[in-house]
Amino acid sequence: MSEIKTDDPKRGIKLRGADKTARIPIKVVPLQEKLKKPEWIRAKLPSRKFFEIKDILREQKMHTVCEEASCPNIGECFSKGTATFMIMGDICTRRCPFCDVGHGRPNMLDPDEPRNLAESVKAMNLRYVVITSVDRDDLRDGGAQHFADCIKAIRETSPNTKIEILVPDFRGRLDIALKILAETPPDVMNHNLETHPSLYRKARPGANYQHSLDLLKRYKEMMPHIPTKSGIMVGLGETDEDVREIMRDMRAHNIEMITIGQYLQPSDGHLPVLRYVTPEQFKIFEKEAYELGFSNAAIGAMVRSSYHADEQAAEALRECEF
């Protein structure tokens, strides 16, 4: 299990919205008038299956990024019987002002979480599961061993289930984290770049664009048969050419799968939406992604990193079998 530092009385206190972003380097400045949400930004209403999935998650004491990050696709994904599990708690050590996950000093790791996760996957009869996490800068391996423990637990109870992990950047702990995840590999390795490097100080304080690229390139070199994946949001202030530059950088670092979706502001305390990319422009990005050599490109306004991840990964996983 990942090692943790000594207990702290401030553990477990979660800050959200303006409280969370109060101390970031570049302050969130709201627009005088918000951009009107276009008609193509629409989420599907939940079905009865949605509530059944929520019951299973609560019973197993599991968190999903779908809920914690206020994902607009939660109704559709839960209704299909799919979910992206968020491990290591619901409190992040980073303060990214685009994200709705709470910030603070996280609680100690739950040693039962890998077993609870495996039981949830089995109860939901999932053929494909995505596991992500908050950033855990308080852990000596960034939480890599906990990811590995979760992978092992799922393999034992659901051997036919494919596993994608969406990992943090393991800042300062990359060598040990990659070693652990090479010894217990997923079926797909995902880490998001999120946005253009010129916007990192504003959108991803504490992160580094080149470090994130190197994470995926190094893992691919260690595990050439494991597909690698990354994603970005649009609407934070980037240009179309910035998006193309990111795609070229991804391919130069052997990233095979890409997601691009529209950023939606979770609250007034988060970064504002600076543009809504049209469906036509998303189609252009998709065409350009395939021309650059991505094996799969999920690109559209409502696309998120794990949205329809099972369908996106199917072709890449088939290719790896041959």
Curated annotation (Swiss-Prot):
Subcellular location(s) per record: Cytoplasm
Enzyme class at the top of the EC tree: transferase
GO CC aspect terms: cytoplasm
Keyword hit for Iron-sulfur: yes
Co-factor binding comment: Binds 2 [4Fe-4S] clusters per subunit. One cluster is coordinated with 3 cysteines and an exchangeable S-adenosyl-L-methionine.
Catalysed reaction equations from the record: [[Fe-S] cluster scaffold protein carrying a second [4Fe-4S](2+) cluster] + N(6)-octanoyl-L-lysyl-[protein] + 2 oxidized [2Fe-2S]-[ferredoxin] + 2 S-adenosyl-L-methionine + 4 H(+) = [[Fe-S] cluster scaffold protein] + N(6)-[(R)-dihydrolipoyl]-L-lysyl-[protein] + 4 Fe(3+) + 2 hydrogen sulfide + 2 5'-deoxyadenosine + 2 L-methionine + 2 reduced [2Fe-2S]-[ferredoxin]
Entry keyword annotation includes Transferase: yes
Main location: cytoplasm
Family: Belongs to the radical SAM superfamily. Lipoyl synthase family.
HAMAP family assigned to the protein according to its UniProt record, in alphabetical order: Lipoyl_synth (MF_00206)
Protein's UniProt name: Lipoyl synthase
